[in-house]
Every structure is written in structure tokens, then in C-alpha cells.
Amino acid sequence: MPIIIISSDSYETGREISKKIAKATEYNYVDREILAPIAEKFNLQKGQVIKALEETPSLFGLSAKLRNRLLACIEEATVGKLLGDNVVCHGLAAHLYVLGVSHLIKVRVLSDSKKLASQLSSEAGGSADKIETLLKRKVKKRKQWSLDAFGLDETDPSNYDMVINLSQIDQDEATKNIAGMTVYRKFQPITYSINCLKNKDLACRARVVLMEQFPDVKVRADGSTIVVEVKIKKRTKQKIAGVIKKLAGGVNGVEYVEVHAASDFR
């Protein structure tokens, strides 16, 4: 069955409608409840793991190196959950890093503007103009975060299969429409798309292992082969390649490792 990934301009709105979709489809629901186990598994602070999903690196916040490691750990855990199929996923930014998987339905849910404004008003107070400014700032912040973290603008409608505005349709009807997409032929799992997700899973698991020593590493997988791109100097390439092959070779499912020297990293 297809996998449904929900992105929203409000975490609360996204969570609410995602739970309804999971109930309607009888799918498993995956959200930020997995962050605590992630923090425990990788010896991280849960607060930092949450920050990685919400904040760009800064002098007084997370460093870029730590943020990237945190996001890699989140990716690894999330993709592992998606392999289970029959999943509604929300709150983990999967719409930005699970790409090229045709049985994955990406949906952007825009909150009821009046409800969102009321929520911000109760939290921050102020005039209608102030609330409008806060809303624009929030959208800009999420755009900056997604571009910095994954090179994609999560506010861009073209990154989704469906965009629903809850100012125009109620949640129950939206739930029905989203759940109805699971029967579309184009979203049914095929061997190629299933293998794409398996490749993503293997690459994520290998990357997490390698990042402790090689923070800027990039990994892609094809079957049991992984290709590793890392910044290395020519004179140390052979030695570093040996270290990488030993580390990556210990990852379950990896049978062959290629190491490429890379000079261009985003």
C-alpha cells in the first residue's frame, strides 16, 4: 500500500489531520514520538533533536555539524519506519528527504487562516497587523530552514502531490480526499519504488555510521553496493578509503563500498 507523508504550516494542524487519516486508512501513524528513542539510541539530547527539525544553525543554537548529524539520525529512523508500509508520517520532514519513491504520497496541508491567526493571537497577543507579520515570518522561517537543511522549499506547492487549504475545506472532507488517493494506481508500490526506498534505508544507515568521523559524507546505495563521497586529500585518499570501507562494511546489508573524493558539497 502507498505511504502518506503530511507536511503542514502548523505542527498541531498536521498532527490532527494525520491522525484522522491514519484512523480512516487503518495505517500506522509515525510522528515525533520516535524522537525520544532516537535520542536514546544515539546518545543525544531530545531537545536538540527537536531543534534540528525547527531551527537553522546559529552562533547561540545548534552548530551546522551537530544539526546535520541530528537530521541524519532522524532520517535513518524515519526511513526505517516507512519500510514497514501502510504508514502515515508527519512531523519528521520526510517530504524533504524521501525522494524518487513513487508509492509515496506527499500532501501539504494549509491551516485554516482564521484558526491559525487565533492560535498565534492567544500565544503572542497583539493587533491583526502584528499577527499577519508573525504569520509571514513563520512561513519565511520554514522556507529558510528547509532550504538550508535539504535544499528544497517546503512551502513550494510543486513539491507535493496534493495541497489542501483548510480555509476552503473541513478536516473530515480533507481526510476523505487524502485517504482516497491510496487507491490510485500511480501510487501503488512496484518493485522499482520499493527498491528505491530500501536503497535509501541502506544509505541512511551507512551515513549515520560514517558521520561520526566524516561529518560531510554523502552516501547513496544500489542494492548491496554503497557509494561514499567524502572530502579527502589525494595523499590520504587510500588510508581514508580503507577506514570508510571498514566502517561501512560493518553495516548490515552492505557488501561492496566505493569511495569517491568529492570537492563540491552543498
Located regions from the model:
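Glycine-rich phosphate-binding P-loop
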Residues: 4-21
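ATP-dependent small-molecule kinase phosphotransfer cores
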Residues: 35-86, 126
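Short, non-transmembrane amphipathic alpha-helical segments
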Residues: 206, 235-259
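N-proximal, solvent-exposed amphipathic alpha-helical segments enriched in charged/polar residues
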Residues: 188-217, 239, 243
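Conserved phosphate-donor/acceptor-positioning beta-strand/loop module used by diverse small-molecule
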Residues: 100-123, 131, 135
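Short edge beta-strands and adjacent turn/loop segments
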Residues: 211-235
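Small-molecule kinase domains that catalyze NTP-dependent phosphoryl transfer to phosphate-bearing small molecules
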Residues: 129-171, 198-202, 207-208, 216
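Short, structured interface segments
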Residues: 170-188
